[in-house]
Amino acid sequence: PKFTFHGYRYIEISGVEHAPELEEVESLQYSSVTEFHGSLTSSHKLLNRFAENVSWSQKCNFINIPTDCPQRNERMGWAGDTHIFCHTALNNSSLKKFYERNLQAMRDLQTPEGQYPEIAPVGGGFGGITYECASIFMAWELYEQYGDIRTLEKFYPGMQKYMDYMKDKGLPGTKVNPAIGPLGDWLAPEETDLLLLWNAFYYKEADLMSRIAGALGRTEEQHQYEALAAKVKKFWNETFVLPDSGKTCNADGTLCDTQCSYAIALSYGVAEDRKRIGEHLIRKTRAIGYTVGTGFFGTGILNQMLTEQGAVEDAWKMMLQTAFPSWLYPVTQGA
């Protein structure tokens, strides 16, 4: 195709009689990211390369819309991929208008019933609550980063409509409407119970909506969302935490005990006994040799949650781990 773009490291030119000289080949860098606020340089060569890879990944995936990958034929605006990287992206670059444009696309694609799309701006996709939460999560992230109340004012009606849509989907609970799924901690080495995750996501939605309503001066709605959050939190801790050991469990009562279940519980604020949950996150991380056992939603918060529990050395060991799967393993393989 003549009118397209690709993320790549290497190119191959075929079908020509004479091999072109290197200086005859031109590569054009195109991105919505015009500059980065800062950079990271350390005494650790692999860590420096990792930081560089993050910057290039952001450049390549931010072309008019945030995409899931720049190098293959998909290159779609998956909402789950978008919201998990939002915090990092906003710390790296000034992207307020970029993300507000994405929020507008999600609102434009919202169904009459209130369901948000899993892909924007083209619509469609699948994923459920872990993807459809993106508008609430990102609107609040933008407000925290920039303090512009107009962002919340503009998108609050759509978020409120979505929360109304969620009322009859079975959350909090274990017998849920199929629309809640099907995706959880996507591509994780160890599987975390879907119902544990979906209820945790619902808690964060309700909690953030109470904060958003409070920021907008909508006191009655703030209290309603606070009550919903409290209800979900109570259910989550009674259902997904074993009372004796404090370990996480699946909806059927069997042991879950994954890094993601502990990291999500801490990061989203749904855990009642944060100290105990934090101890289990540290224990689990040590047990798997400081490798990464999380997927889409557990990975980005893992080191931060370890650090917040006072396990700075554990977080550092995980950051510098090169065994598979880890942050630096791809770098050792040439990434």
Regions found by a protein language model. Give the residues of each.
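Extracellular/oxidizing-compartment recognition motifs
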Residues: 1-71, 80-81, 97-100, 116-121, ...
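Active-site core of glycosidic bond-cleaving carbohydrate-active enzymes
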Residues: 77-335
